């Protein structure tokens, strides 16, 4: 069990093609863990990381906010703040300038909510209000992730060998299938037990 835990804690399943072609949906990617095998403060531009993302659950709301406030999503980043809020509210915090662009920074106050692990590449490392943040993007995506990611959100870093991420193709599809079609697994188990029950009753 310990061996299985150690193995599973060093792999992550790629669930989309946002990092295509270096990683594809269904790949199993080999990672190292923050705080144990690397210091998240040492993450730099070009690293592929796994971070705890809030934005996937608010993606459509963020698009509406950008539209209502006449914001350009290509130059907008959100810092998510969880708390005892009933609904999401947004306020402008300021602006940062990088070598690549200028970004308007907004704070999104949200109710306590789950996060989703996202495997994307760091494209910039910035300072804002005396804190270090990362701007992150999927290689195959036209735009950066809308969330300005703090150091504490970085959980894993993809292991790279000779410039290529260490992946095992297709193995992750089993995990994806079980998550997306869990109800079929439950149905199969119920049918199996019902069959055995009825079969036993006829004896």
UniProtKB/Swiss-Prot annotation:
Gene3D superfamilies: Umud Fragment, subunit A (2.10.109.10). It is a single-pass membrane protein. Signal peptide: none annotated. Its main location: membrane. The chain crosses the membrane at residues 171-191. GO terms for biological process: signal peptide processing. It comes from the Archaea. GO terms for molecular function: peptidase activity; serine-type endopeptidase activity. Keywords: Membrane, Transmembrane, Transmembrane helix. It is found in: Membrane. GO terms for cellular component: membrane. The keyword Transmembrane helix applies. InterPro entries: LexA/Signal_pep-like_sf, Peptidase_S26, Peptidase_S26B. This is Uncharacterized protein MJ0260. It comes from Methanocaldococcus jannaschii (strain ATCC 43067 / DSM 2661 / JAL-1 / JCM 10045 / NBRC 100440) (Methanococcus jannaschii). The lineage of its organism: Archaea, Methanobacteriati, Methanobacteriota, Methanomada group, Methanococci.
């Amino acid at each position: 069990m310990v061996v299985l835990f150690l193995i599973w804690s060093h792999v992550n399943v790629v669930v989309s093609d946002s990092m295509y072609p270096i990683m594809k949906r269904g790949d199993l990617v080999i990672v190292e863990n923050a705080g144990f095998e690397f210091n998240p403060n040492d993450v730099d531009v070009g690293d592929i990381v796994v971070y705890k993302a809030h934005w996937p659950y608010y993606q459509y709301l963020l698009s509406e906010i950008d539209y209502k406030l006449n914001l350009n999503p290509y130059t907008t980043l959100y810092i998510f703040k969880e708390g005892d809020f009933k609904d999401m509210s947004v306020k402008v915090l300021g602006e940062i300038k990088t070598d690549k662009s200028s970004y308007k920074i907004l704070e999104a106050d949200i109710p306590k909510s789950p996060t989703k692990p996202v495997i994307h590449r760091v494209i910039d490392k910035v300072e804002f209000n005396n804190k270090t943040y990362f701007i992150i993007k999927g290689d195959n995506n036209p735009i950066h992730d809308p969330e300005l990611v703090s150091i504490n959100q970085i959980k894993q870093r993809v292991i790279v060998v000779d410039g290529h991420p260490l992946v095992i193709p297709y193995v992750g599809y089993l995990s994806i299938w079980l998550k997306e079609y869990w109800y079929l697994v439950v149905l199969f188990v119920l049918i199996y037990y019902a069959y055995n029950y009825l079969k036993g009753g006829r004896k």
